[in-house]
């Protein structure tokens, strides 16, 4: 790559980072417990408007259809093979993330400035999806990451405009199964790209290969403090704990959050599995919660009231072995959970949605002792 291309790329990265800071700035991580429990977790940052997140329960056999194609034709249609629990957005069956009954997780994150989808071909409308349809399609169709790799070859993701955004949603995806197998899916320059080797974390722009290369600048990161050194008879010791992470970027741009997420997951405490691993995941993601400054101040008063606690609309953690979902919302940091294995999907004739905010849970538990 010549110097002019490098400069152009860096300028694009800078501009996209500014764009992401005012809208989507999500962070995704994975941790594995000693018992093999794989936990996939993410924050959902969106300061442009209220996403109205709902915990959604979908029984197998539910019919789905993609958004209408540019020429008015129907897009892909499918029937879910598996039960699904996940977060749908904007009052529609658009999954920001979720897990199916086989322990497969999908998480959608923003990729502005770089996502470019396959060209729409009218004769292939029946296998075409909008970007926001992809998560639901994967959750309904596949049990493992290996199946997803093959299945992606048989669909096309085309630039269908999401009305709330005014453009085709610029996104990429992390897909993880209960064995720990994981891929990152991106559509860049009109072509499908699948990354089979991942670092277990994902943020936003630029594309994934850039983040992997950028990680080479931080190979010195470690959990332990650097030892003292003798310089001309003077003992030069670290100034307190944390010297192993000197140089760790602290801002909220996607490249910096990626490195920070990588550092925190690689230096995380060893967990036993189950809720212990979920607990560590949520603790790590608390480092990525965005403040009120990330919210668009031009929102109407009602939406500003909803988002007054900051741009992180929710945090969710999926235990892929035990099929449990744990979440927090911007209005209430208490952790709530859903046990997919005990929920009676057979009793459903259609999907049900439960608003994640304002559930009957207290902000704090009163532990004042009786006098």
Residue ranges of model-derived segments:
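C-terminus-biased signal that marks the final domain/tail of proteins
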Residues: 24-39, 47, 52-53, 66, ...
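Aromatic- and glycine-enriched pocket-lining scaffold segments that form the walls
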Residues: 145, 149-187
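Bacterial N-terminal signal peptides
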Residues: 9-19
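Bacterial N-terminal signal peptides that target proteins for export
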Residues: 1-10
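A contiguous strand-loop segment
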Residues: 25-126, 159, 366
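Structural recognition of the beta-strand scaffold that forms the well-ordered cores
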Residues: 39-41, 105-108, 174-176, 184, ...
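Compact, glycine/acidic-enriched structural inserts
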Residues: 58-72, 113-156, 349-356
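A short, structured loop/turn motif at beta-sheet edges
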Residues: 100-102, 139-147, 271-278, 320-322
């Amino acid at each position: 790559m010549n110097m002019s291309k490098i400069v152009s790329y860096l300028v694009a990265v800078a501009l996209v980072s500014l764009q992401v800071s005012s809208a989507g700035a999500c962070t995704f991580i994975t941790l594995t417990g000693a018992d093999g429990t794989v936990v996939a977790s993410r924050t959902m940052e969106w300061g442009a408007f209220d996403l109205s997140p709902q915990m959604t329960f979908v029984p197998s056999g539910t019919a789905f259809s993609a958004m209408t194609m540019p020429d008015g034709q129907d897009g892909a249609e499918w029937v879910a093979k598996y039960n699904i629990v996940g977060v749908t957005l904007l009052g529609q069956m658009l999954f920001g993330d979720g897990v199916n009954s086989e322990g497969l997780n999908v998480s959608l994150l923003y990729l502005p400035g770089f996502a470019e989808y396959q060209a729409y071909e009218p004769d292939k409308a029946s296998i075409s999806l909008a970007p926001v349809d992809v998560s639901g399609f994967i959750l309904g169709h596949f049990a493992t990451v290996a199946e997803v790799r093959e299945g992606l070859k048989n669909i096309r993701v085309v630039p269908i405009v999401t009305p709330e955004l005014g453009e085709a949603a610029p996104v990429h995806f992390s897909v993880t199964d209960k064995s720990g197998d994981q891929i990152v899916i991106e559509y860049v320059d009109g072509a499908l790209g699948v990354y089979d080797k991942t670092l277990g974390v994902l943020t936003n722009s630029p594309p994934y290969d850039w983040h992997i290369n950028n990680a080479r600048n931080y190979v010195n990161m470690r959990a332990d403090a650097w030892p003292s050194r003798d310089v001309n008879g003077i003992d030069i010791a670290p100034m307190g704990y944390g010297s192993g992470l000197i140089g760790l970027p602290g801002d909220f741009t996607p490249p910096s959050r990626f490195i920070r997420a990588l550092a925190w997951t690689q230096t995380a405490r060893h967990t036993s599995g189950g809720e212990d691993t979920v607990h560590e995941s949520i603790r790590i993601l608390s480092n990525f919660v965005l403040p009120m400054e990330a919210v668009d101040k031009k929102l109407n008063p009602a939406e500003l009231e909803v988002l007054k606690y900051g741009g992180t609309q929710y945090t969710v953690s999926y235990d892929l072995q035990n099929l449990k979902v744990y979440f927090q919302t911007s209005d209430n940091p208490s952790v709530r959970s859903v046990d997919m294995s005990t929920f009676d999907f057979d009793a459903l004739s259609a999907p049900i949605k439960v608003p994640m905010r304002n559930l009957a849970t207290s902000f704090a538990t009163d532990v004042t002792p009786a006098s």
